[in-house]
A protein has these predicted regions:
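A conserved acidic beta->alpha catalytic loop
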Residues: 35-43, 293-301
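Short aromatic/hydrophobic "clamp" motif used to bind/position activated sugar donors
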Residues: 78, 336
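The conserved acidic donor/metal-binding loop of glycosyltransferases
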Residues: 82-87, 340-345
């Protein structure tokens, strides 16, 4: 099979020749250098080295050069590189070999980045989140965003050359088409990458540099495509949630007046813990305690009543977070504290949430940020939480969301955002931020180690059922966000020269 090597280059006079020299050792069919926006001798160097040069006076914008090179290439295998990073030819051969043995795409294996004892970069979080939503956790952060990578020419045509200008979108299309993607080699392009102005310049409406902004926008666009193809949960399970019960539910009692704090406690078979959970909530100063018993045994219900709670009784399990919404609708307090029936949390660890609400915090979250420094690589659910906060331009919230208990929410937030959104915790959080409410982590309670291991937490093949459901919640939140903003969210618009790419696509 013939190999075409594609190298987009802009002002790479200092670094291009070593890149070309390594490539020439592979004896490829052709080396295409797409020179664009260059004011130095990049073009002359490429021509002098015997490369096929495609020249544009203007800068094309990131990845447009790749797509143009791919369309113009005559080989059977397309190998993509950058003009500023020389990769040993022995490594490059591993990418082309993977295509020769029948795979469609061969990616650079960068999963080692996630194992370092540091917090993941927002771009790594976005890459991991996309692979998780595509149910390919095994791909970690492997992506078409990173070089080197190789694609079979016929597969590139099926993906669409125009889509190669958006690597996360191309990656998504490839997986949805059932293409075979592998990561046969680990080439270090992180420590060798040139720091550019776009890596440092931060636009006014964002906490992220320009390059990060673009890449996150590209990942939102890829998720928009997944949602369009697979529905608002991206094809991920909703668990056994009974959503109808919430829309049909209107409390037939009038709200009590003068109640400051309510607590909502969903409970299944929690006879061992329920009485102590209620006792601590009372001790924290909560006046109204509502236990939403769903699929609960009689002992749990009896103990909840004896402990002084109001019990709303449903014979069937309602599914995750549905009881939260029902309990919140029934409750009367100005502030609602959410805890679970199977984790006993002492009053001293519950009070900070109520106090934060008194001091002006609208949504007071459990501060689990320390897990970012303790768990490497980041857990899939934590990655989804972090991604949501990155999309909301609140990276300061890290992995803190209303998915984790305990948390406290003010009544006016629930009234404005809508009680039914409590069924999908990330959607509730996203809406709260979009409405301008103050969302803050306030106190750490270790719920990770005390959480009961249930059957749905077990991995059988691919993702555990609980992980799939939680990821689906985050995709659903993203679907709402995209519907309210754009296919790139509120990240930098795409100003790349697609017009010049389409000229090539239409003329060749």
């Amino acid at each position: 099979l013939k190999v075409s090597v594609i190298i987009p280059a802009c002002n790479e006079a200092d670094s291009l020749l070593p890149v070309i020299k390594e490539v020439q050792k592979m004896k490829p069919f052709e080396i295409i250098v797409v020179v664009n926006g260059s004011s130095d001798t990049t073009k002359e160097i490429a021509e002098g080295a015997g490369c096929r040069v495609v020249y544009y006076e203007e800068a094309l914008g990131i990845n447009i050069g790749r797509a143009i090179g791919a369309k113009k290439a005559k080989g059977d295998i397309l190998l993509f590189l950058d003009g500023d990073i020389a990769v040993p030819h022995e490594e490059l051969m591993k990418y082309t070999k993977a295509i020769e043995t029948g795979h469609d795409i061969a990616l650079n294996n960068l999963s080692w980045i996630m194992k370092r004892k540091v917090r993941p970069h927002p771009v790594s979080v976005a890459k991991y989140m996309l692979n998780l939503c595509l149910q390919r956790e095994d791909l970690s952060i492997q992506a078409l965003t990173a070089i080197p990578h190789a694609i079979k020419k016929t597969s590139a045509a099926k993906i669409g050359y125009e889509n190669l200008a958006h690597p996360p979108l191309a990656h998504t299309i490839a997986l949805l088409k059932g293409m075979s993607i592998v990561a046969p080699c680990s080439s270090d392009v992180i420590y060798t990458n040139k720091i550019r102005t776009t890596h440092k310049t931060i636009p006014t409406n964002s906490p992220f540099p320009i390059s990060t902004n673009y890449i996150i926008g590209d990942h939102i666009q890829a998720l928009a495509h997944l949602i369009e193809e697979k529905g608002i949960r991206g094809g991920l399970t909703d668990g056994d949630r009974n959503r109808e019960v919430v829309s049909a539910y209107t409390p037939n009692v009038k709200r009590k007046t003068g109640v400051k704090y309510s607590a909502v406690i969903p409970a299944g078979e929690e006879k061992e813990t329920i009485a102590n959970v209620i006792k601590e909530v009372k001790k924290a100063g909560v006046e109204e305690i509502i236990v939403v018993a769903n699929g609960a045994d009689e002992v749990t219900v009896k103990r909840a009543i004896e402990a002084g709670a109001t019990v709303l009784h449903y014979k069937q399990r309602l599914g995750h977070n549905v009881p939260r919404a029902i309990g919140a609708m029934y409750s009367s307090g100005e502030v609602c504290l959410f805890v679970d029936g199977d984790i006993v949390i002492s009053a001293e660890h519950l009070r900070p949430y109520l106090e934060a609400a008194d001091q002006g915090v609208d949504v007071a979250l459990n501060n689990l940020e320390c897990l970012l420094d303790e768990v490497h690589p980041i857990h899939s659910v934590s990655a989804a939480k972090y991604f949501l906060n990155i999309v909301c331009k609140r990276p300061d919230l890290t992995i803190n969301t209303t998915t984790a208990i305990p948390h406290a929410i003010k009544r006016d937030v629930m009234e404005k955002v809508g009680y039914e959104s409590l069924i999908i915790p990330p959607l509730f959080q996203l809406k709260s931020i979009m409405y301008g409410f103050m969302v803050q982590p306030v106190h750490f309670v270790d719920v990770a180690r005390t959480n009961r291991i249930r059957k749905e937490h077990m991995k059988v093949k691919g993702l555990a059922a609980s992980t799939q459901r939680i990821l689906g919640d985050y995709v659903e939140a993203m679907a709402y966000y995209i519907s309210q903003t754009s296919e790139r969210g509120e990240f930098l618009p795409d100003i790349r020269r697609h017009d010049l790419l389409f000229e090539v696509l239409n003329n060749e």
